[in-house]
Amino acid sequence: MNALVIFGLLAVLMLTGMPISISLGLTVLTFLFTMTQVPLESVALKLFTGIEKFEIMAIPFFILAGNFLTHGGVAKRMINFATSMVGHWYGGLGLAGVLACALFAAVSGSSPATVVAIGSILLPAMVKAGFPNKFGAGVIATSGALGILIPPSIVMVMYSVATNTSVGALFMAGVIPGLALAATLGGVTWYRAKKFNYPRQPKATWGERWKAFRASVWGLLLIVVVMGGIYTGIFTPTEAAAMSAVYAFICAVFIYKDLGIKDVPKVLLNSANMSAMLLYIITNAVLFSFIMTNENIPQALADWMMGNGLGVIAFLLMCNVLLLLAGNFMEPSSIVLIFAPILFPVAIRLGIDPVHFGIIMVVNMEVGMCHPPVGLNLYVASGITKMGITELTVAVWPWLLSMLGFLMVVTYWPALSLWLPQRLGMI
């Protein structure tokens, strides 16, 4: 009964158009002060202890690094490198977009940032080269979702905060699925380009490829700094985030010189605004998690599933359906922070690896970012292409269907996610 009251109140507040963070906070406070005897002091204590986690500090640093790289011309150099490598294949610029999104995802940690950085440069070039606007929009909107699967990933950090799972293990677990999804999206792009005979670029010489690689190498080295540093134990994921922010600043301002010193305060302010917004969501989500635990809702869900003989396969299918439905109305950070505290205890009780479950949630978030009505990538791509959301929804379907198929593979083949972190001794 209490669960129905909590989720009913949350749904009503969200339907009024109230921001997710405020809806969460009001739901918790209303329930606590009217239907429980929980002391106010314990609520305040939980509020502060819940956000004292060291991992949370990684979020603003990864956001800052992504903003420096987005404004610093790194994306343009990555696109040139990607085009030199695959531009001569069918759908060359489209394949270059997939590859560039994968590379930029490995340094930004954000899907919308990836779509903006790559799409704003590549989409006009694709249209100019003779590609249909729909094709380019479909490629970039879906490939941009790689930003939260290929590490570093802000959504993975939030999952770690919500479930106390190792950030480093999550990052390593995202590498192979991220590359596999990039290959899948590239395959769809190549097939459609060949089917409709879309244009190909002239084949670049190895000299041109080497020149493009040298121009982009400073941005690509950030991948080595973050992932190499975490794996070798030189620094923790949070320290890696701080290092990536400093490196991205040096790269954008002093090496590439695409960002002037006078532009740095604007980047810092934008990063601070986004970080504050996410921290506010986390704060209210911590309270929501507290009330879930206090009312034993995850435990009751686990007991119900076990009592009805529902096993791992049925539970994971239910999770996918629930998370995909939530993706229709909420953005990834909110979904992870609301649903992870509810579903995670059940997953652990059923023997599902916490790292594998985290990757499943992240892939669900990727799909959610590419379908209406609240798919963030669709709105970002719409702003770049000037296409309507309905038209854009039709454009992304071939890639979106392949992502749904990939979701099933990730869900029921744990080795795809767990092989690398197990080999590295991280789990």
How should each PLM-predicted stretch be described?
Residues 1-427:
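Alpha-helical transmembrane segments of multi-pass membrane transport proteins
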